[in-house]
Structures are given as structure tokens and as C-alpha cells.
Amino acid sequence: MSYKENSFYQDILVSECFYVATKSKQLIGYEILGESRVCLWSDKTLAQPFLDAKGIDFDKVKKIDVDRFVTYELDNIFNEGDQVLVNPTTKSDGELVDVVKVSDELMSDLDSIRLKEFAKDVAKEDAVFGLSEKGAKQFALISDDEHQRPHIMPVWSIKSRAEKVRREDFDTLELVEIEGAVFDDWLDTLRDDDKAVAIDLKPGVVGTVVSAQKVIDQLAF
């Protein structure tokens, strides 16, 4: 079952975030079909009226970045087949969805969208930004040990995004700009060495990681 046509799915795809209610730092659920389900909302304004109407005590409604959730929290909180209640309101019971499946589908679509946007920006500006050790002639590689990805080259198509991540997560490295043609050559080497590319990472080092071949294919369009 695909969730692509659901309105909540499209909302999260655009905003790249969702909202949950917490009490003492624990996720709040609501009993439906005899079982308590964690509630989440694609629109923050839907949460409090529902919680108040149901008499559910909570500390706050918290914004969750979907990349950070999938990278650091999903596997620690949920198991395969677990369902969450999406967008319950005072007028609607909401939808029960498989949290792992919908997360996988969202990330697949986000990866595709980001890769296309990256390629479009690079074609327009003929510039790619990366991080480098002082004096080095190559972009730095990072590791994602948790997902067994030891060699990843983070790159950005927009300088301000790159600088924000550099400042918050890699302050010992320098921001470097190269031309698109140089990046094309580097991609061939990354592909031959079976290394990955991180596209427009967010602070916290979360976001889209794809094979070098996928980037090559997209830039060819």
C-alpha cells in the first residue's frame, strides 16, 4: 500500500517535518481499536484542539524533522509493523499508518526530489560546494558507521546551506567551491571507488545519501 495520495503525506513531503505531543519527554498516544497508538500531525494547529478535547495531558507539541527522526529515532522507538495515528482531530479519527513503511516511502521520495533539485541548481550555477581540510585539493569524506557507510562525500548546491552545516558540525574544515566539470570528474572516481555522495545535508549531518552513479545519472539529464 502506498501513502503517496494521502494529504498528510504530501504535507510532510513539502515541510519535511511533523509534530508529536510529549509528556515528561515521552510520546503521547491515544487508544484506538483497543490499543494505544502514538499520535502525530502534519499540521501543528491540529494537535492541541484534539488533545484538549480528549482531556489528554501534555507538556508540549514538538516539531520533528523527518530526516533526523528516520536517522536517529525510528529504529529505537518503533518495530516493523507498528502503526501510528496520523492527524486525529476533533472531527476525524485520523488514519492508522505503518510508521516504518511510510517513513521509507517518504525518504525515497525526498531523496529523488533533492537529487533533482541539486542537479538543477548545479546546471544553472555551475558550482558545487564542499568541505575540505586546510590546503587539501579534494572535498573531505565523512563516515556513517551506524549505516555502514564509511566513505561519503557531502556536497551542496547552495553556499548558505553548506556554510550553515560547516559552522555547526564541521567547524575545523573550510568551505570550498568547485566548478561543475571538476565535480563530474570527481564523481567518476567516487563511483569507481564505490563511495557515496551526501546531497545538501542539514545541520546534524542528516539528509540524502546516494551512490555516485545516481548523481551522475541525474546530472546527465
Can you annotate each of these PLM segments?
Residues 1-221:
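Conserved NAD+-utilizing ADP-ribose enzyme module
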